[in-house]
Amino acid sequence: MSAAAAPAPERGWKSEKVDEAQALARSCAARRPDFQPCDGLSICATHSHGKCFKLHWCCHLGWCHCKYVYQPMTPVEQLPSTEIPAKPREPANTIQISVSLTEHFLKFASVFQPPLPPDSPRYCMISDLFIDNYQVKCINGKMCYVQKQPAPHSHKMSPEEVSAHDAFISKESNTPKIDHCSSPSSSEDSGINAIGAHYVESCDEDTEEGAELSSEEDYSPESSWEPDECTLLSPSQSDLEVIETIETTV
């Protein structure tokens, strides 16, 4: 008897839970009249994922669970639509701008010319930045700048030019010579011949200072400038010796 009586209280407990769940579902559904109870035939996604994707609702014990209530989407066929006329009933007072601009462009297309190509970049040589009016001369083991002699004129000078040239030579001979390898304090251009005089001293004489610079015991970076022979460098060679290591961006 006890075994048969046991299922009765269990069924009563389940029925109470069902009534409670249904009452909760009814109160929830009362606020959403668009929801309907599950018909028991459709498979509702709420049972597996907790979401209902149907227009009807269903969940635990066949009624809506307030936790998973979603607004259904409006069917496409119920959306408002606008009728599109097949042909305009009356001519519109508008023009197609693209067609008008195209016609206007084709009328004047022959007048248009392509833009001029940009000028190619101009590069300058580093030697062009310096005035090549001097020569590099080795005197007593030192590299000195000596002004170049002017190029001889091919045309014959008039008597007036000859007299003026002779007067200039006599004046130049009376001018005292300045040491062209002097220090910057005694010459404004620090070694460059300032008065334009042409020096013809021989390089055969070696002073004690030149001997000291050429000795192997007291070697210094300046001694690397001393040539083996005392020669008169041409302007092109002087550019290589003096200007080769200069990097300039123009």
From Swiss-Prot:
Residues 201-250 are annotated as: Disordered. This is UPF0524 protein C3orf70 homolog. One of its GO terms (biological process) is circadian behavior. Keywords: Neurogenesis. Pfam families: UPF0524. May play a role in neuronal and neurobehavioral development. Belongs to the UPF0524 family. Residues 202-229 have a biased composition (Acidic residues).
